[in-house]
Amino acid sequence: MEYGLDLEYSFNEFFKGFGLSSEIAHIIWLPIPMLLVLVAAVVGVLVTVWLERKISAAAQQRIGPEYAGALGVLQPIADGLKLLVKEDIIPAKADGILFTAGPILVLVPVILSWLIVPFGQNLLISNVGIGIFLWIALSSIQPIGLLMSGYASNNKYSLLGGLRAAAQSISYEIPLALSVLAIVLMTNSLSTIDIVNQQSGAGILSWNIWRQPVGFIVFWICALAECERLPFDLPEAEEELVAGYQTEYAGMKFALFYLGSYINLILSALLVSILYLGGWGFPIPVELIAKFLHLPINAPVIQVFTASIGIVMTVLKAYLLVFIAILLRWTTPRVRIDQLLDLGWKFLLPISLANLLITAGLKLAFPQFFGG
């Protein structure tokens, strides 16, 4: 779908109506996209935490949060405020600088990765040509922060958790990147906008999940491992490592780990939606909607409606995957560290490599179905 609302253009036009120049309007606009990302990420975390509490309660035949607002919807806010006012303790023998920098280095790359997530044709912060490659590069920074946090804590459980996190991330980063390369090969572009547009030809049948079922499965497994979700939560296994690299953290620093974990889960689900499930695309062509309403295709009403539907479709697809991830947490046992590494190196890596080679062959043989 090639139509949509351009927020920056609309914002500039709005301020031009007050007599401001386009340069001043652009300067005013600069911090707004990042604020929108932060608000969207925090709201997404609050919704996900509430969903996880309710789903886990249902899995264990409990009621779950009930008293903090209707159906307990304010419970995540109460949890956040509790962590915010807790004392920030740095262990006496810890490396204070690295101890403080670790959580920041974990959270910042995840936040920056949202820059390339599109919710519509023009609804993204930065349409860089190397969008998906930028995400892979940013995601490779996070293990450094985890290892740094484990090392700086001067605690054996923290160090072991940090080492596990680094080993796990390295093991699953490669098959994840190879599965993404298969999509890039079909699309001939690293732009997330181009990847979604390439899936808009024949509705749901154009989604990459039908042409890349193996890549979809590999990507989702690797994404869960990158997010350290059960059954891949070895770096913070409570029964073995207390809380892993988070053991010595409290207050706001611990909240940064907590926030980063859930933002990363939502980001991974959004990227699966974009890469494999058509992103913001929906079955009814925008031309038919405009014709039904007797409006031109570029009418403001059509643009706002298209943008709204695109956001809803992207978020719904992502939260379907978040729901699956939460269910997996309460229905699957934790694997051993050797099993986790074997799965990454001995199974997912060769499978993703074979999938990439097969995709290249199919593209040469059937360019009309696998990209021209």
Swiss-Prot record:
Its main location: membrane. It is a multi-pass membrane protein. NDH-1 shuttles electrons from an unknown electron donor, via FMN and iron-sulfur (Fe-S) centers, to quinones in the respiratory and/or the photosynthetic chain. The immediate electron acceptor for the enzyme in this species is believed to be plastoquinone. Couples the redox reaction to proton translocation, and thus conserves the redox energy in a proton gradient. PROSITE patterns: COMPLEX1_ND1_1, COMPLEX1_ND1_2. One of its GO terms (biological process) is aerobic respiration. This is NAD(P)H-quinone oxidoreductase subunit 1. The chain crosses the membrane at residues 27-47, 97-117, 128-148, 176-196, 204-224, 266-286, 308-328, 347-367. It is found in: Cellular thylakoid membrane. Its EC number is 7.1.1.-. NDH-1 is composed of at least 11 different subunits. Keywords: Membrane, NAD, NADP, Plastoquinone, Quinone, Thylakoid, Translocase, Transmembrane, Transmembrane helix. Belongs to the complex I subunit 1 family. GO terms for molecular function: NADH dehydrogenase activity; oxidoreductase activity, acting on NAD(P)H, quinone or similar compound as acceptor; quinone binding. It catalyses: a plastoquinone + NADH + (n+1) H(+)(in) = a plastoquinol + NAD(+) + n H(+)(out); a plastoquinone + NADPH + (n+1) H(+)(in) = a plastoquinol + NADP(+) + n H(+)(out). It comes from the Bacteria. One of its GO terms (cellular component) is plasma membrane-derived thylakoid membrane.
